[in-house]
Amino acid sequence: MELRTLLNKAIERRHSLAAITNCLRLVNGKGDGCDGLLIDRYHQHVQVQVLHERWSKRVDEIAQILISMMPVDYLIVKSRQGLDLNVKVLKQGDPKTIVEENGLKFEVDLNDGLNCGLFLDMRENRRMVAAACKTKKVFNGFAYTCSFGLYARHYGATEVINTDISKRTLKKAEDNYRLNGFEVSKDEFVTTDTMAYLNRAVKKENFFDIIILDPPSFSRHEGKTFQVKRDMPVLIRTALEVLRPKGRLFVSTNYSEISHAQLEEMLAKSLNTRRVEKLERVGQDQDFPGSNSFKESYLSGLWVKFL
């Protein structure tokens, strides 16, 4: 199939999302018949990720097609070859822009590494979790730019604690809070290791109604390493020690070697005396067709209500 036809078909498939957001994945690799090609739209900014060399020679063509199909203020191509990230800007402009999602605003920066400030695949999960946050005390671990925390505040949470080891990303989170008219409390943004914070919370008997955990596959901080496949059960067990009765846990990973079934096994090993009332498997949003069939588009998540 001609490339223009493939791209147009992929874009049309996502037309219904226009009512709730102006940032979405336009092309999701082989899920859209374009194995090795990812295209994300952030309002009128476009990011193209090239994961296979066959697309490398066609990036100019891809850019021209996209610019002819929609308003584009800025277009950047990111090619991943092993651990190296090669960046090429094909339409110059300000790499920063403000996007909207379910009535909330977020600033993103497409020239800030591979992740620009908002994980698009988590859109529906953010809305789902936030809908349960009214009048609740919420803990958001591995918070990145705190999109879950911002949603929780928007939906009426009485208290939110966001933790992340990166002071820089938490500063971006504070900017997003202000962008949406929320006052920024320094107590709400804690630059710390999430596991360390949870261990302190256990000692202080600092309990939460809702806990959100979306850890990285691997991280290193102050000489300690976190490996999600090794450490997820301990992380969940510690979190459950400070989850109130009738509380809810959202836990997810984009590590392609952990399936939903394996994540459920990790949860089961971590329960101790806790009992599950309801468990729901969740994944990436609808603009990620083919999700979990290839490692570049992967998310296993659980939304759990406890007795």
Segments predicted by a language model, with ranges:
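Conserved class I S-adenosyl-L-methionine
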Residues: 135-144
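Conserved SAM-binding loop of SAM-dependent methyltransferases across substrates and taxa
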Residues: 145-157
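S-adenosylmethionine
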Residues: 194-269
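C-terminal catalytic and target-recognition region of SAM-dependent MTase-like enzymes
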Residues: 248-307
